[in-house]
C-alpha cells in the first residue's frame, strides 16, 4: 500500500510540475533500469509524439524495481537490465509472458575521473594506490553490480579491492560517485558513461556473464496495448537507432 501511494504521489508531482509540456492522452508508467536514463531521455519524447500518450519514467536498480512491482507498484511496463528478473516475474504471473521481448545487451565500462590524469586501461590498474575508492552498483539488487563483481573476481582482484569498494544504489548513482570525486574510478554501464567528468574503456565481456536486457507488460496494467506499443517502438527502427547511439548491442547482434 505504501509503495502504491508513494508512486502515485511521484506521478502527481510530475504531472503538476510547471513548465513541462506533455501531450494529452493516456499515461504509461514505465519502470526502467537506470542504465536506460540517457537513451530513454531521448526516446520517450519521440514515442509520446507518435503515440499521443504521456510516459512517466521511473528509473532505479532492476532488483529494487522488480520488488516494487511484486508489491503492487502501479507500473505498466518493466524494462530490466537482466532478463532473469523479467523471467522471474513472468513465472510469478506478475508480467504478461506474451509481451516479453529482449531489447538490448548492456556493456560494462571502466570509468576514470578525469581529474586523476590518464585514464585507467584495465582492471589491474585499480590496484594503483592513487585509487582510494572504486564504485560499483550494489550486487545484491543491481545487475551491473553483479557483473562488476564477476569481472573483478575473474581478474583475480576482488579480495584486494574490497576495502576500496563503494556501492551505488543503481548504476546512475554509481557513476555519480566518479563524477563527484567520491570515487576515483568505477565500473559503470557504457550507456551512461559519456559524461564530461569521466573517461572510460570497455571491460572485456568475457570476464562476466552477459547483460541481456528484457522487458514485459505488467499483468495489472490498465493499458497493456499501449505498453506493447512502447516495447515495439523501442525495438523498432527509431528506437533501435537511439539505443545503438547510446552504446547498447541490439537483438540480432548478440
Where in the sequence are the language-model features?
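Positively charged n-region of N-terminal signal peptides that target proteins for export
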Residues: 1-6
Amino acid at each position: 500500500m505504501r509503495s502504491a501511494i508513494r508512486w502515485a504521489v511521484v506521478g502527481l508531482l510530475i504531472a503538476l510540475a510547471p513548465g513541462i509540456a506533455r501531450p494529452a492522452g493516456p499515461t504509461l508508467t514505465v519502470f526502467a533500469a537506470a542504465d536506460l536514463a540517457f537513451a530513454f531521455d531521448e526516446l520517450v519524447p519521440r514515442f509520446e509524439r507518435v503515440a499521443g500518450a504521456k510516459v512517466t519514467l521511473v528509473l532505479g536498480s532492476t532488483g529494487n524495481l522488480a520488488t516494487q512491482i511484486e508489491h503492487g507498484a502501479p507500473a505498466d511496463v518493466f524494462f530490466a537490465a537482466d532478463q532473469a528478473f523479467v523471467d522471474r516475474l513472468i513465472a510469478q504471473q506478475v508480467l504478461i509472458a506474451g509481451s516479453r521481448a529482449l531489447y538490448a545487451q548492456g556493456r560494462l565500462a571502466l570509468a576514470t575521473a578525469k581529474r586523476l590524469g590518464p585514464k585507467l586501461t584495465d582492471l589491474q590498474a585499480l590496484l594503483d594506490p592513487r585509487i582510494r575508492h572504486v564504485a560499483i552498483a550494489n550486487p545484491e539488487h543491481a545487475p551491473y553490480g553483479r557483473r562488476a563483481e564477476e569481472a573483478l573476481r575473474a581478474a583475480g582482484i576482488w579480495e584486494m579491492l574490497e576495502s576500496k569498494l563503494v556501492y551505488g544504489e543503481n548504476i546512475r548513482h554509481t557513476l555519480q560517485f566518479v563524477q563527484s570525486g567520491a570515487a576515483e574510478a568505477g565500473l559503470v554501464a557504457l550507456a551512461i558513461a559519456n559524461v564530461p567528468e569521466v573517461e572510460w574503456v570497455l571491460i572485456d565481456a568475457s570476464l562476466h556473464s552477459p547483460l541481456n536486457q528484457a522487458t514485459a507488460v505488467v499483468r495489472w496494467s490498465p493499458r497493456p496495448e499501449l505498453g506493447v506499443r512502447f516495447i515495439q517502438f523501442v525495438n523498432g527502427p527509431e528506437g533501435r537507432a537511439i539505443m545503438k547511439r547510446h552504446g547498447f548491442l541490439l537483438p540480432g547482434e548478440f
